[in-house]
Amino acid sequence: MAARLRRKVILGLGAVAVVPVLAAASPGAAGAAAAAGTSCSTAGTWQRGELNVYWLDVEQGDAQLVVGPTGKTLLVDLGETAWNSTGANTNATRIAQRIRSICGVSGAVHLDYVMASHHHLDHIGYAANPNDTSTVGNGLYRLLAPTGENFSVGTLLDRDGGTWTDANRDGDCDVGTSADPSNEIAWHNAGTTSQTARRWICWLYGPAAQPDRANIAGRVVRLTNSSPWPSLDLGAGVTATIVQANAKNVMEADGVTLVSGDHTTEAVPPSENDYSIGLKITYGKFEYATAGDTDGEYATSSFGYTYNDVEASLLGPFGNVETLRANHHGSTHSSNSTYVKTLAPESAFISCGSNSYGHPGNRVLDALRQVVNERGAGADIYLANNPCDLAQADGTTPTNYVGTLNANGDVHLRTTQTGLGYVIDYDTGSRTYTAYDEGSGGSGDPSQVRINEYLMAPNASGPNEWVELYNPTTQTVTVGGLYIDDVAGGGGAPKQIPAGTTIGPGGHWVFEFPSGFLNNTGTESVRYLAISGGETVYDSHSYSLGSTQYDKVFHRIGSGGAWCNTISTNVTKGAANPASCP
C-alpha cells in the first residue's frame, strides 16, 4: 500500500497549518514488482534507542543517513562527483555497502524515506534513461534501481521542480542532450536546469511500467507549494519537519518577484540551489538543521544566475539548534552571519572534498568559530575531508582549517540519554556534548532585548527593510510571537516575529520584511513590543528624514549602546555595530 498519512498541527514559515505525518510504508507494500529490502536491524552498528546521524563522505557532494531510535531510516541525498561513473566506481556502490554495515543487512536494504534536497549531480547523482545508448546511472538512481543496488524505499521525497508531459506522445520520457534538451519537462519551480534534473524527473515521473521505476513507483511524494508539507515518522520521540522547499514565499532581490515558479526561460534565472529542501529533526532536547545548498545572499553569479537569500525564511522554523549542517558545502554564498548567529549551533558539519570553488569559505569557518551559543562561544567544525579546497574562491587566499576536526571519512552523531546529550565520532576520536532546551524557547526576559540597528530604504543592499534585535542577557530569549511596529495607532500593520524565534545570549537577530513598511522621509518610529489586548512596548527609536537615504542605517554604538542620531553608511546587519557614531 502507499505511504500512510496521519495528521497533526505544526508551525512552519510563520503560519499554523494542519499537515500530514507521513508514516513509513513497509517493504514491498506498493506492489509485488517492488524489491522487498530488509530494514535496519539490531545487528547493525547504529545506536538503538537514540537518534543517529551519519554524514557520509562522498567527497565534493552530500549524503546523510538518519537512523531513528527504533531503526527507521532517512537517506538525504547521495551525490556523485562524475556524471559518467558507473558500477563499482560510483559513490552509490560504496555508500550502499556502508548502509548495509550500519543497518546489519547483507543484501538490499529497505529505507523508510529517501529525500533529494535539490536536483544537482553532487546531491542526487545521474539517472539512466530508457533511451540511453551507453551505460550510465549512479547516485540515488543506482541505489534504488532493480539493476543497481536494488534497495527499496517507503517514500521518496522530491521538491517540486517539474513533471513529465510526454510532449511527443511516444510513451516514454525523453531527455534529449545538453546541446538539444527535450521539451518533455513542465517546469514548476526552477531556474537553472540541467540534464541531471531532466533525467531525475523522467525517472521519478515517467511511465509507471518503466522497469527501472519498479522500486519507486507509487512511492514518490512531490512537495508542492499548494499543499502542506508532511513531517516524517522516524520513530517515537523524533520530530522530523520539512520547513522549506521550492523557495516558497521568498522574494528575489527586487522585492516583488517570487523565487518560486518557472524561471527557466529568463536570461539570469535563480540558482537550482535556492530551491533546496530544509529539514529540522528533534529528539529530546537535541535539534538538528539541514537545508541542502540553500543560499543566504542576494547576488548575481558570473555564470549567469542569481543567488537569493532563502536562509532568511529558515530562521524562525529552525531557531536555535545543537547541530547545523552548513549549507552548500560551506560556500560563502550560504551560512550567512545572521543564519549562523540565529541557529547558534554547538557543532557543525561541512560536506566537502577536493574542489576549485573555495569550499569551505573562510567567512563561514570564522562565523562558526565565533558564534555565541549555549556553551559559550564557538562551534566545533567537522569536515568530510581536510583539506577540501586549499584556497578561497580568489585562488590565492589560503583556506584556514585551524581547529577543524576529521581529516577524511564519515562522521557519526548519536544522541545520548534519549536526546539529553550527544556524541560525535570522527576519524581520531569523539566529543561529548550537552543538548539544551532551545526547542522549548529561551528562559530569558524578552523585555531586555533591544532594537540595535535598522534599515528603512533598501536599494543596492537588497529588496527588504529590516530591524536587528540584540539580546544583552546571558540567557536565550524567545522573541517569537512579539512584534515590530512603526508609529503607535497608525502606519502599517505590526509585523509579527515568527513563532519559535529565539536569540542566544549576546546574539543578534534580523527581522526582514518587504520594502514599504518604514517611512523613507518624515518622522517615523521603530518599536519592539508585545500585543495582547493592549500594547507593551519594550523598546523604540524615532527618526526624522527630509529625503530618502538609501542603504543607510540608524544604529546604536556597539551592541546595546547609546543611539547615534546621525544616519550611517556603516551597515553591520546581524553583527556588532561600530564603536563610535558617524
Put a short name on every predicted segment.
Residues 69-74, 79-157, 313-331, 344-349:
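Active-site metal-binding motif and surrounding structural segment of the metallo-beta-lactamase
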Residues 59-63, 72, 80-83, 119-124, ...:
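Solvent-exposed loop/turn segments at secondary-structure junctions
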Residues 321-392:
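Internal alpha/beta domain cores that form substrate/cofactor-binding pockets in large enzymes
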Residues 36-52, 58, 98, 107-108, ...:
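Flexible, acidic/histidine-containing loops and adjacent segments that form or flank the divalent-metal
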Residues 2-33:
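Secretory targeting and sorting signals
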Residues 442-582:
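Intrinsically disordered, low-complexity linkers and terminal tails enriched in Ser/Thr/Pro/Gly
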Residues 84-86, 121-129, 133-136, 164-169, ...:
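Extracytoplasmic/secreted cell-surface and envelope-processing proteins
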Residues 53-55, 63-67, 73-77, 110-117, ...:
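Structural recognition of the beta-strand scaffold that forms the well-ordered cores
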